[in-house]
Amino acid sequence: MAVRFIREDGDEILRKVSKKVDVIDERIKTLLDDMAETMYAANGVGLAAPQVGVLKRVVVIDVGDGLMELINPEIVEQEGEQIDIEGCLSIPGVAGEVKRPARVVVEALNREGEKITVEGKELLAVALCHEIDHLDGILFTDKVIRFIDEDEMERRRENKRRNKIRQNKG
């Protein structure tokens, strides 16, 4: 396993449509391993193959419930809407509010080539949509409603910490 270089906004590969994976071989499994290591090293919750320079429909996600590896992911169902703050490892220092579905169902293959179905709500729904967008050359900044500056981000983090403390006491 190896940490790969994360491509940043302005790199043309981030704007290209990724190709479907036809065969899950050792190269794809190594890619999955490297992507997970890269995502964790960068403190991310998701990473798509184009972000490490590979135009294949492969993503890894971990929103705190364990690593998810998705090959050829496709959103097959979505409902509701939510607005949340997003950032991106390929666009460091930038955050903004983005409207996404509140719930999505994604079909994909796992590393063994088995079909899997993932239902995502809240943060997982956001992460699934965000990473699948990468596979189509779409960045979150294309969908941003409003950019958030660092001061506002810090205020929101502090409010979340306070709310967690209140919940734990109550």
Curated annotation (Swiss-Prot):
GO terms for molecular function: metal ion binding; peptide deformylase activity. The keyword Protein biosynthesis applies. Fe cation binds at C88, H130, H134. InterPro entries: Peptide_deformylase, Peptide_deformylase_sf. It catalyses: N-terminal N-formyl-L-methionyl-[peptide] + H2O = N-terminal L-methionyl-[peptide] + formate. The active site is at E131. Pfam families: Pep_deformylase. Its EC number is 3.5.1.88. Binds 1 Fe(2+) ion. Its cofactor is Fe(2+). One of its GO terms (biological process) is co-translational protein modification. Keywords: Hydrolase, Iron, Metal-binding, Protein biosynthesis. NCBIfam families: pept_deformyl, PRK00150.1-3. Belongs to the polypeptide deformylase family. Removes the formyl group from the N-terminal Met of newly synthesized proteins. Requires at least a dipeptide for an efficient rate of reaction. N-terminal L-methionine is a prerequisite for activity but the enzyme has broad specificity at other positions. This is Peptide deformylase. It comes from Acetivibrio thermocellus (strain ATCC 27405 / DSM 1237 / JCM 9322 / NBRC 103400 / NCIMB 10682 / NRRL B-4536 / VPI 7372). The lineage of its organism: Bacteria, Bacillati, Bacillota, Clostridia, Eubacteriales.
